[in-house]
């Protein structure tokens, strides 16, 4: 099952991915209801959809919200209960029986490399975090060609996301001698590459 947003689906960005899955002898299904901040209603719908289609693998295709939605769905397929109870620690995480692949289409969230997810309870206006060794993707595929579909301003915005994470890591109270040089290096790399989309956008004006 591929998890993505409606815009990604409507633009046909999944076509080559779906063709690749079919060429491997698999029949893909698509849950294209991913929304910003991964609302719990969307996650619940995705869980139901995945169970109805008896999926054995999930592919997250999109930005951080699609990643978080896919992570939450993957974690909940083998347990009974609700995603909010899972986030609150009322449901014990267990090793997933399904495979989780992550293909990011932005360059800033880093969600494809972490075992942490965030979902939004819009009714309570509260974001829940879930984090455990089974929440992270089994495989992450980074294809720079996918970034060509983004506008320079969107690339810059998502790169600023990466810069912000690095700045937080450097300035937080838990920073240590191992973390600080890595955070500084990450900020330097982010700053260097932020200039490229900015210059490209200026040249188009």
Please state what every model-predicted region is.
Residues 10, 14, 39-43, 51, ...:
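Generic structural signal for well-ordered, non-membrane alpha-helical segments
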Residues 78-177, 181:
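A glycine/threonine-rich phosphate-anchoring loop and its flanking beta-alpha core
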Residues 9-81, 198:
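N-terminal small/polar loop signature for handling phosphorylated ligands or for N-terminal nucleophile
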Residues 192-199:
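Conserved small/polar residues in nucleotide/adenosyl-binding loops
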Residues 4-5, 33, 103-105:
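Cofactor-binding loop segments of dinucleotide-utilizing enzymes, especially the Rossmann-like FAD-
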Residues 1-2, 57-59, 101:
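Conserved beta-strand elements of the Class I
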Residues 203-205:
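Hydrophobic alpha-helical segments, chiefly the membrane-spanning helices
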